């Protein structure tokens, strides 16, 4: 993963963890947890593309891999909707900027995962 994406993930996760939103903190913690999970998945998928041995292993487990990939895209869509909702209800400009950046990062990561998955298919 490129260093800008790594620092973007870390920056957004740090800022989200410091937020105190009117909605329950459990909602935000869920978003943070999903965001971290997505980051790890994206990292592992990128590493898999780099190692041909894993490529052949993934081909052998193709059905399971495709199901997992589908679940990750569902998680991304859920995160995008949650962040859009949070963006609509927040009035704090710091939070708005954080959510806008999180949304941009999610869209970038979704595109990267799509690119990696096409390379693996």
UniProtKB/Swiss-Prot annotation:
Subunit: Interacts with protein M1. May interact with host nucleoporin RAB/HRB and exportin XPO1/CRM1.
Gene3D superfamilies noted in UniProt: 1.10.287.230
Signal peptide range: none
Intracellular or extracellular location(s): Virion; Host nucleus
GO biological process, alphabetically ordered: exit of virus from host cell nucleus through nuclear pore
Record motif Nuclear export signal, residues: 12-21, 85-94
Location, primary (coarse class): virion
Lineage of the organism: Viruses, Riboviria, Orthornavirae, Negarnaviricota, Polyploviricotina
GO CC terms, sorted: host cell nucleus; virion component
Highest taxon, organism lineage: Viruses
InterPro entries: Flu_NS2
Name of the molecule in the record: Nuclear export protein
Task of the protein: Mediates the nuclear export of encapsidated genomic RNAs (ribonucleoproteins, RNPs). Acts as an adapter between viral RNPs complexes and the nuclear export machinery of the cell. Possesses no intrinsic RNA-binding activity, but includes a C-terminal M1-binding domain. This domain is believed to allow recognition of RNPs bound to the protein M1.
Record gene name: NS
Record key words, sorted: Host nucleus, Host-virus interaction, Transport, Virion
């Amino acid at each position: 993963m490129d260093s800008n994406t790594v620092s973007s993930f870390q920056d957004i996760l740090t800022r989200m963890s410091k937020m105190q939103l009117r909605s329950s903190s459990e909602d935000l913690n869920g978003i943070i947890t999903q965001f971290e999970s997505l980051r790890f998945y994206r990292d592992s998928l990128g590493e898999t593309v780099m190692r041909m041995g894993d490529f052949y292993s993934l081909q052998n487990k193709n059905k399971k891999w495709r199901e997992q990939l589908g679940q990750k895209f569902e998680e991304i869509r859920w995160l995008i909707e949650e962040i859009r909702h949070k963006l609509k209800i927040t009035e704090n400009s710091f939070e708005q900027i954080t959510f806008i950046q999180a949304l941009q990062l999610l869209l970038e990561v979704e595109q990267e995962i799509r690119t990696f998955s096409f390379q693996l298919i």
